[in-house]
Design a protein with these regions (language model features):
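Positively charged, solvent-exposed patches that mediate nucleic-acid binding
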Residues: 1-136
Length: 136
């Protein structure tokens, strides 16, 4: 089981925003490779996870409810499905607070599997060829 730590620094959120992105009906999932820095160490068996909901979603009580629901769903999904040494950011959407919780969990699981698949595949054919050459 993977240890899930909290992403807190703004520069980490900005770095992850430049990485991969998968959209689902109730959330957006972003991911990027973890980088060590003076304010944090990368655990061998862990990943970092951050949450954000913008003011476009609604007033504070709606944004807070959306973040609570994202955290609860992530507690179910991430320990078994996330990859080590990857930083993830969950972004709440306008319907995150209202969507059925089981659907939110299933959409999060699908998005996480999709982004992990993209991470594990080589970026282009030249990378795949280099990987084959190294294997031989």
């Amino acid at each position: 089981m993977l240890k899930v730590l909290i992403l807190k620094k703004r520069k980490d959120f900005v770095r992850v925003a430049q990485g991969l992105k998968v959209a689902a009906p109730g959330l957006i999932l972003q991911a990027a490779q973890s980088l060590s820095s003076p304010h944090r160490e990368i655990p061998e068996d862990g990943c970092f996870l951050g949450y954000t909901v913008t003011k476009k979603v609604g007033k504070a009580h709606i944004r807070n409810r959306s973040k609570r629901r994202l955290r609860a769903a992530a507690r179910e999904v991430f320990p078994d499905n996330a990859r080590a040494k990857i930083d993830y950011v969950l972004i709440g959407r306008y319907n995150t607070a209202d969507i059925e919780f089981k659907k939110l969990v299933s959409e999060m699981k699908k998005a996480l599997c999709k982004i992990n698949k993209i991470i594990s595949e080589p970026q282009d054919k030249t990378d795949a060829k280099k990987a084959d050459d190294i294997a031989d």
